[in-house]
């Protein structure tokens, strides 16, 4: 994931605790901590390889106290109360929707920042069936590609 897209995602974070699902190299939690947007983060990935890369980057930046890593699928490794904001970027829409099907188990999650690679209309349709609404929709360009970032807030 390139820096411009990461910066755009991080700039949308409005809460102190973050869970980054499909963290890959943990760039989102690292930049979120470094920028002061969040105080603590959990980087979650389903695969060992990306999680090891994430851990290396976290340790290299000296952020092991602020960012914890967990191996697992989607929101399953997360406990309610651990994160107010969840980021999911760089996955297809169907995968994101599958992950978010567990969303109702988490009363503490107040914001979603989602950047699907495919089927933006399907995501818009899905989010309208949840307790969240799209607060802001950004489109950024990196190289020849356009990326859409949805900042969604919980209806309270």
Predicted segments, located by residue:
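Conserved class I S-adenosyl-L-methionine
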Residues: 15-24
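Short helix-capping segments at alpha-helix termini
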Residues: 35-37, 59-64, 105-107
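Class I S-adenosyl-L-methionine
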Residues: 2-5, 76-77, 82, 94-156
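S-adenosyl-L-methionine
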Residues: 1-16, 30-31, 48, 52-80
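Conserved SAM-binding loop of SAM-dependent methyltransferases across substrates and taxa
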Residues: 25-37
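Conserved SAM-binding motif I beta-strand of class I
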Residues: 40-45
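Short SAM/SAH-binding signature in class I
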Residues: 83-90
